């Protein structure tokens, strides 16, 4: 599928969502919409594995295809006709049965062993009745059993799957909510409409894993745009994610040598819907690199579930990622609380977009927490440095961390000044990047990116003032590929550009009391033109003489005409 088609699929699904949600809160409708898209992915992926597993035994009667693989004719954006994979082949035939349901009916004695085998191979099982194709058939026929079937299907996938990444995956999807309708039949009818429209919209497009993943990501972005301040809880705009991923995928000690071949592990400790982690993965794979393990932590249960779905929808195997539902500040994940320093998890790359100036309640014991012991505990009024120190603690000695923070961390006093000073004296702050205002859905304030390393080589800090480099949009300002590329290239080669970037020695920073306010070091103001006073004076004298000469000549003419002279 072309990039244009992928974008059009996302827009089609968004238009469906915008039309169908009615008075329902966008965040609530988002969870239903994305869960159904995810069920479509699970079904397609599972049926493909089933077909491979059963081989010649897979029912191939005419009209019976896996849900989502029938060919339909559609019109592409350029007006040409094309064949597309359609989910409306979701049923095997007119009776609504899928090929898998036919096999189950013909081989009842083999079902248990077959499902055991599928759990071992794909780590989850979807019963025929719960496949997307069967669900769409119920929706299109306005079957009263749809809601009940969905509830049972979600529960089965969660409880009967082999991998822990499926546990509680649909826990926040309340199919019995009054928001869908007061009575069962109203809720069932609403779900029939939603699912039928999703199936209709997707029928026009080929929907492989990458396409579904991109559509999912597009919808997350659109819902984020409509969520205002809440968007910051689960979504980092792609333009900002691209900067962070571009930085951490370069060689950590010698960025100018280019991209790394492998990241053994990458961490985002406030991962939201996972868009930032997936951006890092995309950066690595597009250049032929690999990632060993993707690790994330998310406090919000709904967003945590969105993240796990997002990973799977982008083709990340459940063995390749681990997302934990928990609180980063209290560090309640046993995996990260390893008491033996030799066994402490460490990451090649750490990326994060934590909540800005988050109020927290650090207890007295926090001063002894290994994450904060060397630098200090962030104040209650702003946990920014607590998040930063958490990430730095788990960074490998040769790793690189890129974190988005408000500008206050660069100059605020008190305990934050002491933490900042210690980080600078220890040589951990490598680069400070100032971004334009109004890039986020959740806030209009300008933010910065801090790049940190445990063993950085240059005895200076690179400042990049990109605050004026943007395209003004109606709601949010935008960074073009050129803007993003310039930031990454400047970091990579530590380039110095007038009114844009500068390498500042530690002595100068120390002389400024370790204040990192970007405008102190890189001003975007146009320099005033120097005036040569002697030359200017000579020019004015010459002009004055010219005026006097012209006036004298003019007065001669006036005298001949009998008129009074000019003064």
What is each residue range found by the language model?
Residues 8, 230, 270-272, 294, ...:
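Short glycine/serine/threonine-biased micro-segments
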Residues 1-253, 319-322, 328, 434-437, ...:
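Non-catalytic, mostly N-terminal accessory regions of nucleic-acid modification and defense proteins
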Residues 2, 189, 193, 230-233, ...:
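Alpha-helix N-cap/helix-initiation motif
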Residues 2-4, 328-331, 335-567:
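A conserved structural/catalytic subdomain of Rossmann-like adenosyl-cofactor enzymes
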Residues 233-352, 357-359, 364-373, 386, ...:
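Conserved S-adenosyl-L-methionine
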């Amino acid at each position: 599928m072309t990039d244009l088609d992928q974008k059009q699929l996302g827009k089609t699904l968004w238009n469906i969502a915008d039309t169908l949600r009615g008075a329902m809160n966008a965040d609530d409708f988002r969870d239903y919409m994305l869960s159904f898209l995810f069920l479509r992915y699970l079904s397609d992926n599972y049926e493909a594995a089933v077909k491979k597993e059963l081989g010649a035994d897979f029912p191939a009667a005419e009209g019976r295809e896996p849900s989502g693989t029938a060919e339909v004719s559609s019109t592409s954006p350029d007006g040409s006709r094309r064949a597309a994979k359609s989910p409306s082949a979701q049923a095997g035939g007119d009776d609504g049965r899928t090929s898998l349901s036919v096999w189950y009916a013909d081989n009842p004695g083999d079902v248990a062993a077959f499902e055991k085998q599928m759990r071992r191979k794909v780590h989850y099982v979807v019963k025929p009745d719960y496949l997307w194709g069967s669900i769409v058939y119920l929706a299109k026929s306005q079957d009263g059993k749809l809601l009940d079937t969905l509830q049972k299907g979600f529960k089965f996938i969660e409880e009967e799957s082999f991998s822990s990444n499926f546990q509680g995956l649909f826990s926040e999807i309340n199919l019995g909510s009054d928001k869908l309708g007061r009575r069962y039949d109203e809720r069932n009818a609403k779900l029939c409409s939603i699912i039928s429209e999703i199936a209709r919209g997707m029928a026009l497009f080929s929907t492989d894993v990458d396409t579904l993943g991109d559509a999912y990501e597009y919808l997350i972005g659109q819902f984020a745009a409509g969520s205002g301040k809440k968007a910051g809880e689960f979504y980092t705009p792609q333009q900002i994610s691209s900067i962070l991923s571009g930085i951490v995928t370069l060689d950590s000690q010698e960025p100018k040598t280019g991209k790394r071949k492998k990241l053994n592990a990458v961490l985002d400790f406030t991962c939201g819907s996972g868009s930032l982690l997936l951006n890092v993965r995309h950066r690595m794979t597009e250049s032929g690199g690999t990632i060993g393990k993707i690790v994330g932590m998310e406090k919000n249960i709904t967003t945590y579930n969105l993240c796990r779905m997002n990973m799977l929808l982008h083709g990340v195997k459940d063995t390749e990622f681990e997302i934990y539902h928990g609180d980063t500040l209290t560090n309640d994940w046993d995996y990260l609380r390893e008491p033996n320093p030799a066994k402490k998890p460490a990451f090649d790359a750490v990326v994060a977009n934590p909540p800005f100036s988050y109020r927290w309640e650090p207890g007295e014991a926090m001063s002894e927490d290994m994450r904060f012991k060397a630098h200090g505990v962030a104040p209650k009024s702003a946990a920014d440095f607590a998040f930063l120190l958490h990430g730095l603690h788990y960074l490998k000695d040769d790793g690189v961390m890129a974190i988005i923070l408000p500008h206050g961390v660069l100059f605020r006093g008190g305990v934050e000044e002491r933490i900042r000073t210690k980080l600078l004296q220890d040589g951990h702050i490598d680069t400070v990047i100032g971004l334009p205002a109004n890039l986020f859905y959740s806030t209009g304030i300008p933010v910065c990116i801090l790049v940190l390393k445990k063993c950085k080589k240059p005895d200076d800090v690179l400042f990049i003032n990109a605050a004026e480099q943007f395209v003004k949009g109606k709601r949010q300002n935008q960074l073009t590929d050129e803007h993003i590329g310039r930031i990454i290239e400047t970091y990579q080669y530590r380039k110095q550009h007038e009114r844009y970037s500068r390498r500042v020695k530690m002595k100068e920073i120390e002389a400024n009391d370790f204040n990192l306010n970007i405008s102190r070091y890189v001003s975007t103001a146009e320099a005033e033109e120097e005036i040569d006073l002697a030359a200017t004076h000579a020019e004015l004298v010459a002009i004055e003489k010219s005026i006097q000469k012209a006036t004298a000549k003019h007065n001669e003419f006036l005298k001949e005409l009998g008129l009074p002279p000019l003064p």
